[in-house]
């Protein structure tokens, strides 16, 4: 779960205007270079009494990890959201042949 704002009255549920949630992700195995990262909503629970405005993206991508950004604005109220991600890039492997 990226966040849940309904139970504790968090800003995504109780406020309006521009809001952002940030969630740091650390890769289990670091990549050899900066990977390509894809993020997408896998669940959202949003109030139906206003427009549903959401922007989800990957930021600060490094070989060690990245930050998920979940943004909304206006009068959109978000109770909770889950984001899935996939990172693609080269990693070390025990069969790699490295020259000195």
Which stretches of residues belong to each language-model region?
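Extracellular attachment/recognition segments
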Residues: 1-100
């Amino acid at each position: 779960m990226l966040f849940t704002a309904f139970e504790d009255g968090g800003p995504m549920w109780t406020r309006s205007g521009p809001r952002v949630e940030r969630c740091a992700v650390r890769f289990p195995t670091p990549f050899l270079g900066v990977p390509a990262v894809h993020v997408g909503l896998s669940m959202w629970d949003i109030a139906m009494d206003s427009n549903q405005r959401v922007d989800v993206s990957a930021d600060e991508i490094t070989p060690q990890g990245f930050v998920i950004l979940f943004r909304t604005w206006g009068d959109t109220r978000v109770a909770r959201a889950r984001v899935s991600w996939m990172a693609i890039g080269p990693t070390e492997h025990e069969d790699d042949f490295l020259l000195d």
